[in-house]
Amino acid sequence: MSNRDHQPMEAMHADDRSWETLRWPGQESKMLFHPSPERPTAPNAGLVRYEPGSHHPFHKHDFAQVWYILEGEFQIGEALHGPGTMLFYPDPHFEAPPSTRTGGLMLFVQYQGPTTGGRPIYDGRFNMKERRAIAEENVER
């Protein structure tokens, strides 16, 4: 394999992106990198901001993901997690509903599952023009 076959590093500053509507109420995102037709295996990687009281329903994914809590406290299952906590969800996984009384900020990285090959979804989840009711969301993927 020659150097021509390798891709260059990319850099993006969070201030260069605007907050976008995430599919769950009380949540906004800045995905600095995300899948596109030209780059279908790119990760969803960026920030998710939560308003106090924000949560989302139990659901499942075929991709893998890592969350790093930067601000706030999040109840996930029986445990309360705060700043400095990193959570890893292998593929496939069920995602217990995180909820926050304080509001908060997380670094999100969702990537193609090494076991399932499932890819994260950007369009219609992290960049919504208008949020749908939770009951209308697909929680099976």
PLM regions and their residue ranges:
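A short, N-terminal "cap"/entry segment at the start of jelly-roll beta-barrel domains
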Residues: 1-42, 123-141
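Conserved metal-binding segment of the jelly-roll/cupin
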Residues: 51, 80-102, 109-112
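Glycine- and acidic-residue-biased ligand/ion/polar-headgroup-sensing regions
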Residues: 52, 61-76
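Short, low-complexity cationic-aromatic patches
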Residues: 58-63, 136
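Double-stranded beta-helix
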Residues: 96, 100-141
